[in-house]
Amino acid sequence: MNYIYHVVLPDSWTQQLNVDSYQHDSLKTEGFIHLSYAHQIEGVLQRNYIGVEKVLILKINPDLLTTQLVVEAAKTGELYPHIYGVLNKTAIESIEERFLDK
């Protein structure tokens, strides 16, 4: 199984606890939710979460997604998965709390 992952700030996740699906702000601004493969997580954290104390890492089973998953090249040419719609929470297999170095 090739799991995919989404990094989210705890406050953003908490605001959506009582709904069946998750929407990141990027869905409105870019049309999709950014995801990563396991080997990309550390780079994503280093590039996008500088100065952040804690994040949650959602482990997602792509076979359980109810919205379209597309793998696309970033500006660097590296391939990243994106979800073009909301993330159904039934596809989330686990949530890891990760403390980061400030």
Q: What do the predicted segments below correspond to?
A:
Residues M1-K102:
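Conserved, structured core segments of small domains
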